[in-house]
Amino acid sequence: MKKTLYDKIYDSHIVYEEKNNTSLLYIDLHLLHEVTSPQAFDSLRDKNRKVRQPKKTFATMDHNVSTTSQDINASGSMAKVQMQELIKNCSEFNISLYDIKNPNQGIVHVISPEKGMTLPGMTIVCGDSHTSTHGAFGALSFGIGTSEVEHVLATQTLKQQRFKNMKIEITGEIQKFVTAKDLILFIIGKLGSSGGAGYIIEFCGNVIEKMSMEERMTICNMAIEIGAKSGLIAPDEVTFSYLKNKMYAPRGVFWKKALNFWKNLKSDKNAFFDKVVNINISDLSPQITWGTNPDQVISIDQKIPDFSSFDNLIKKDLAKSACKYMGLKIGTYLTNITVDKVFIGSCTNGRIEDLRAASKILKDKKIANNVKAIVVPGSGSVKREAENEGLDKIFISAGFEWRLPGCSMCLGMNKDRLNDGERCASTSNRNFEGRQGRGGRTHLVSPIMAAAAAVYGKFVDVRKLYNGENN
């Protein structure tokens, strides 16, 4: 029987199969952070249980951490308690932890791939929605709730239904100044925020094949915003080259054995997909969200759509509500809209390639007087690499604040947030009401679009930046 990549990984991890299309799956890697794990550990203690596989469990601090100080007191009282609990829990249960003083600390979905913890064919879970990021390596990865965190800690397994298969084949030639972030935003807009519900999405096609691993991670990171359980990309030579000599990757004879296994991790020819979507992106433009959901997105050269263009009443009502919250009107070009803050970072766009791309836009420029801008490297390793390349100096010279690693302004859970009514060009992954702070207005864009907005104090078409049209 021909199998998809998803079915191959799912089937190879079945511990016990039930008749209702649900199985108990073995989990290869369990990632933890300070927010969704404390209750799970408390429950283990209440039931006198141990962590079954501490060496297959890894923790870091990212959601609540201060990006201006490594002092645990700088993050606020609640964050301090959560971080102290994580330190205590990891010590008691013998789990590796990158705390805020560790030079490699950072966002969990940045650390795991860059250290070679994430490997093709794995099952990976974390108490965080954007665990789908790891699917870029051909790993079946998804977010779980706190009760499931407890279950995996105790058993190294998880009960999981079998999802349907969707293939999104992306072809064409991606244009200059159009990025992986623009591509995934476009796909979300095309399919809608529930278009992937009930599916695991495999991304493929010549565009994906040409992407770096960091670009692929951006794609899979936001698969959840289509409503999918996760996203997958089959591993290839790009994957293997990225992983070679990483800290936790196999070495020597084990590397050769791993390669032999990984090279077979792809969907069989003529494998059945429940849904197939073909997208040609040769004419794709830089994208920007205008509403309060990632699927409310347009090209930078388009107007906010008329409510009558939506095909059902629910979408019309959501669009009206979004425009009201965002302080926008239909028919408006976002290039006429000023910004208050710019955020470059997150598990979507906080890697070294993202910082390099943004720094090229900012070199020898200054940000607008009306803008406060911060750049937050996704990990200590990313921060050091950027500093070794002199990127920090470019950002600082332009007027950005160069911060410590963390989730930062992606979510209003730490001290980096928007004030009521402030508008932000953000490289993060969600733009819900209040996501970056109560009353804050979030526009999702690529790192280069965010950098350009910082320079001009408003949204601009980055393609025109070097043509003298945004003066």
Swiss-Prot record:
Cofactor(s) in the UniProt record: [4Fe-4S] cluster
Cofactor remark: Binds 1 [4Fe-4S] cluster per subunit.
Pfam families linked to this entry: Aconitase (PF00330)
N-terminal signal peptide: none
Gene Ontology MF: a single term: 4 iron, 4 sulfur cluster binding
Binding residue positions for [4Fe-4S] cluster: C347, C407, C410
GO biological process, one term: L-leucine biosynthetic process
PROSITE patterns per UniProt: ACONITASE_1 (PS00450), ACONITASE_2 (PS01244)
Family of the protein in this entry: Belongs to the aconitase/IPM isomerase family. LeuC type 1 subfamily.
Assembly notes: Heterodimer of LeuC and LeuD.
Protein name in UniProt: 3-isopropylmalate dehydratase large subunit
Species this protein is from: Buchnera aphidicola subsp. Acyrthosiphon pisum (strain APS) (Acyrthosiphon pisum symbiotic bacterium)
